[in-house]
Swiss-Prot record:
Its main location: cytoplasm. GO terms for molecular function: ATP binding; pantoate-beta-alanine ligase activity. This is Pantothenate synthetase. The reaction proceeds by a bi uni uni bi ping pong mechanism. Keywords: ATP-binding, Cytoplasm, Ligase, Nucleotide-binding, Pantothenate biosynthesis. Homodimer. Pfam families: Pantoate_ligase. GO terms for cellular component: cytosol. The gene is panC. The keyword Cytoplasm applies. Beta-alanine binds at Q61.
Length: 282
């Protein structure tokens, strides 16, 4: 595995690889890698001749009161995970390398961002789309891999790739969970012991809701109320949202039918956790 820190060297390598006909699987991350990231890397390894991993904590996607400064970082750990999962190139640029001057152009996402995390975090997805436009141009991937834990992000990325005719296939990968159901996340390290014990109730609330839908419930408000009340009963977290939308278009659902997403965000003392399930309802 080779570690690359400059845009110029990374672009030169990927240009040569694509010119020689090699397929490139790309996994963009903010680091502090866990089993969820490892799953993305293994899938990229299975489906491509070359695997590129980026580790970059992107300041553009953090709001003024968010956790940019304390976002967990451990490049030694990330290098080990990368090596163990078949990464060929680890792209690890500095902020100054990615943004050497004030950004004069950003990608403004106008659809699929006014709900869920996009509603709570204005400007977040513009930051995500902008850095991905840069990373796609730097790494020239054949396929790019994203976890469905942030399903809204996947929907936004699929839309922006289609809109700009970017020649990359977006590959969504199922959520990876702890044994007790908690979705794996770099931010789980912020949980206190008590919060960690309560956190699996987020996924349990989604499973209970799924059972109700499969049993025939089609009223969206009944389902979202059930989820909120369950979380408020069994955790000390504050429900930021518990919402149902069509997926991937993220339109409001009254009657549950077709492909939908039930997504939640819950705030604990030092961390905000998200989770979701997608299902197709006939």
């Amino acid at each position: 595995m080779k570690i690359i820190t400059t845009v110029q060297e990374m672009q030169q390598i990927t240009n040569e690889l694509r010119a020689s006909g090699k397929s490139i699987g790309f996994v963009p991350t903010m680091g502090y890698l866990h089993e969820g990231h490892a799953t993305l890397l293994r899938k990229a390894r299975e489906e491509n001749e070359i695997v590129v991993l980026s580790v970059f904590v992107n300041p553009l996607q953090f709001g003024p009161n968010e956790d940019l400064d304390r976002y967990p970082r451990d490049i030694d750990r990330d290098e080990n995970v990368a090596k163990e999962n078949g990464v060929d190139y680890l792209f690890y640029p500095s902020v100054e390398e990615m943004y050497p001057a004030e950004q004069t152009t950003t990608v403004e996402v106008v659809k699929r961002t006014d709900v869920l995390c996009g509603k709570q975090r204005p400007g977040h997805f513009a930051g995500v789309a902008t850095v991905l436009m840069k990373l796609f141009n730097i790494t020239l991937p054949t396929r790019a891999y994203f976890g469905m834990k942030d399903a809204q992000q996947v929907a936004v990325i699929e839309g922006f790739v289609a809109d700009f005719n970017i020649p990359v296939t977006i590959v969504p990968v199922d959520i990876v969970r702890e044994e007790d159901g908690l979705a794996k996340s770099s931010r789980n390290v912020y949980l206190s012991q008590e919060e960690r014990e309560e956190a699996p109730h987020l996924y349990r609330s989604l499973c209970i809701a799924k059972e109700r839908i499969e049993a025939g419930e089609r009223n969206a408000e009944i389902i979202t109320t059930l989820v909120k009340e369950y979380i408020e009963t069994y955790t000390k977290g504050t429900v930021d949202y518990a919402d149902l939308y069509t997926y991937p278009s993220l339109q409001v659902v009254d009657k549950i039918e077709g492909r939908i997403i039930l997504a939640i965000a819950v705030k604990f003392d030092n961390v905000r956790l998200i989770d979701n399930i997608t299902l197709t309802v006939k």
